[in-house]
Structure formats: C-alpha cells, structure tokens
C-alpha cells in the first residue's frame, strides 16, 4: 500500500 511505502 502507499501508506506502508511512506512509513520508511
């Protein structure tokens, strides 16, 4: 998901 990719 987009949220998981942003939480790097």
Curated annotation (Swiss-Prot):
Its main location: plastid. Keywords: Chloroplast, Plastid, Thylakoid. The keyword Membrane does not apply. Signal peptide: none annotated. One of its GO terms (cellular component) is chloroplast thylakoid. It is found in: Plastid, Chloroplast thylakoid. The keyword Plastid applies. On the 2D-gel the determined pI of this protein is: 6.7, its MW is: 16.8 kDa. This is Unknown protein from spot 105 of 2D-PAGE of thylakoid. It comes from Pisum sativum.
């Amino acid at each position: 998901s987009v949220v998981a990719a942003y939480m790097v």
